[in-house]
Design a protein with these regions (language model features):
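Active-site cofactor/substrate anionic-group-binding motifs, chiefly glycine-
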Residues: 1-11
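Glycine-rich anion-binding loops of enzyme active sites
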Residues: 14-108
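Glycine-/charge-enriched secondary-structure boundary and capping motifs
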Residues: 26-52, 59-66, 71, 140-141, ...
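Glycine/charged-rich beta-loop-alpha catalytic/anionic-binding loops adjacent to active sites
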Residues: 73-74, 114-121, 188-191
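Phosphate-handling active-site elements
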Residues: 76-81, 114, 167-169
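Glycine- and other small-residue-rich loops at beta-strand/loop junctions that grip anionic moieties
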Residues: 83, 94-96, 123-127, 146-149, ...
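Internal active-site segments that recognize and position negatively charged phosphoryl groups
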Residues: 89-95, 127-153
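A short, charged helix-loop
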Residues: 110-128, 183
């Protein structure tokens, strides 16, 4: 639910209704289905109050398959696409960077002591909480391009850059706050915090570009700028940066 709601928010819209299609084995207990439905609605109530599940489809099969479709309202605004970034715009983020990747690393470590100690980071992976209401706020503030960070900051920056025929340059010093939030678990796991910030996905934070003259919503933090198209889509302090984010098609 969270990732689908974030997709609507990233268009600058307000999520309104959800349609759920499910395939479940014939042995599935009604109590499980009821609990699952309650969980879906609880997620809506928490992340996007007013959004409701209005229908869907249910079929039987060998394994559980779930498809979620979210519809939204632009409330008179234009949709914010990936293709509108302009040279001179600022690049800004609303929400954490690298926190979900940190949680995944903790889970993959299998170290139960660490998993318990850093429960907040683990929850970021298992139960993300994107800033859904800030999508409309960004649209109202004049966002020129936007998406949610689902596959890694660098990869998603690159998507805006390609769609807009520009290059996005990030200021490393503006990432220090995100890195600081990851310091303790990173030390425990022996991981470089910057790799999580740049390449970790599934935070579903909002990544947007705005005119330099725009008054950004308070929740957005400027991390860089849009420059003329160069040989590389994304730069970090003027240097090319490796893209090692998630590829949904390749599955890696």
């Amino acid at each position: 639910v969270a990732s689908n709601l974030a997709d609507i928010a990233a268009m600058g819209a307000k999520p309104t209704v959800l349609v759920i299609a499910m395939v479940v084995p014939k042995t599935t207990k009604i109590s499980w289905l009821e609990a699952f439905a309650d969980g879906l609605q609880a997620a809506c109530d928490q992340l996007s109050p007013g959004a409701a599940i209005v229908g869907g489809d249910l079929a039987s099969g060998d394994q559980v398959v779930i498809s979620v479709t979210v519809h939204g309202q632009l409330e008179g605004l234009n949709p914010v696409l990936r293709s509108g970034a302009k040279v001179g715009d600022v690049v800004a983020v609303c929400g954490p960077l690298g926190k979900a990747a940190c949680g995944l690393a903790l889970l993959q470590s299998g170290n139960q002591d660490l998993i318990r100690s850093y429960d907040d980071w683990v929850k970021a992976q298992l139960k993300p909480s994107p800033p859904i209401d800030q999508g409309v706020a960004a649209n109202q503030a004049g966002a020129t391009a936007m998406l949610d960070v689902s596959d890694g900051l660098v990869r998603d920056l690159g998507r805006i850059a390609k769609a807009s025929s520009v290059t996005l340059e990030i200021d490393r010093s503006q990432l220090s706050g995100y890195e600081a939030m990851l310091d303790l678990p990173a030390q425990s796991l022996g991981v470089d915090t910057l790799s999580w910030v740049l390449q970790g996905g599934e935070d579903h934070s909002l990544l947007a570009t705005f005119p330099a003259s725009a008054t950004l919503p308070r929740s957005f933090k400027i991390i860089g700028k849009v420059v003329a198209k160069a040989a590389h889509d994304v730069l970090l302090d003027g240097q090319p940066v490796a893209d090692a984010g998630w590829d949904s098609i390749a599955g890696n």
